[in-house]
Amino acid sequence: MKAGIELISHSQASHATYANSMTLAEKGPQRLKRQFKEHSSSKESNVSRWLKIFIRQFDIWFPETIPTMKVRYELLRKNFIKEIFNSRAFIYPFLGFYEVLTNPVYWKHILLFAVCYALIFVTIAGLFYVTLVPLLVTWAILLLGPLGVILVHIQWILQTNVLTAFVCRTLVLTHITNQIFDISLVLQDQDEFLNEVKVLPKPQKPHRKIDEPDAVRNFNTIKGSRIFKIPRLLFRMFFKVSNFTSLTLLSLIPIVGPILANQLMAPKRTFTYLQRYFLLKGFSKKQAKDFQYEHYASFICFGMSAGLLELIPFFTIVTISSNTVGAAKWCTSLLKGERKKE
């Protein structure tokens, strides 16, 4: 009898031990899951805390960046779809081309432009032929055989033309293009606008207020120091070099590369052609960029049409001038629209 009772109690104890072990086994994964959730939530809280600190410091040192990005995003969101279907900016380069061919007043400037263009083209073509063409020829012969030599030389002419157009438009011949722009405005009865803007005093930078607190004055002094400007200059330089390098590598693709690079530069090309308009209107760099984002679809349309006209080798001598006239025609349309609103 006692043996039976001991056997029953022993079985009950083992059953209880098994139940406790099963309970602990069931609670183990739950405890691990709970600890993992707590750990992940603590990591998320640390990341969010550091992110908030970074955003706060970014707002302190770059107070205008985030608001400017928000404003430009809203301008894109409101106007892009509407302008992409309604904009007539793509037609102005062709109108300018027709006017340049039919109006002799531009021919003297085009002749001077042609001489400068020829010198720059020969220089860039020689450098390009000595440095990159041998490598491209070797690669093309291995892949395409004798046909590769012909394609490389076509690529050499297209690439040289693209670089020459870029140098002429942005670095060397801006004075000639500014004269062509002003002549076109006068021919379109905008001489009153030119006379007004040329006699207006240049805007001066606002002076510091006398009652400005010392802490604010010291902070602004730190922000305006050269040490603070170095990181921003390095970032901008890195961005420009990366952009230029990527476009250059893209343009090395036979035949198709220069066309793609030409079209990808459409907004930048339009901004370059309208720089004279921004100067005459007295726009700051920020205002000019805001104008670009407000009419970004029109910038793309104008830049693509102007780029196609610039793409034909040696034809660029005429088309850079005609695109400048087209930009002046577009600006005349904008000025007339502003007067109607007034």
UniProtKB/Swiss-Prot annotation:
Topology within the bilayer: Multi-pass membrane protein
Transmembrane segments: 110-130, 132-152, 241-261, 300-320
GO cellular component: ascospore wall; lipid droplet; prospore membrane
Protein's name according to its UniProt entry: Outer spore wall protein RRT8
Location(s), subcellular: Prospore membrane; Lipid droplet; Spore wall
Phenotype when the gene is knocked out: A combined deletion of the LDS proteins RRT8, LDS1 and LDS2 fails to incorporate dityrosine and another yet uncharacterized component in the outer spore wall.
Cysteines engaged in disulfide bonds, as pairs: none
Cytoplasmic side: 1-109, 153-240, 321-342
Entry function: Involved in spore wall assembly. May be involved in the modulation of rDNA transcription.
GO biological process terms held by the UniProt record: ascospore wall assembly
Entry keywords, A to Z: Lipid droplet, Membrane, Sporulation, Transmembrane, Transmembrane helix
Origin species: Saccharomyces cerevisiae (strain ATCC 204508 / S288c)
Membership in a protein family: Belongs to the LDS family.
Extracellular side: 131, 262-299
Source species, domain of life: Eukaryota
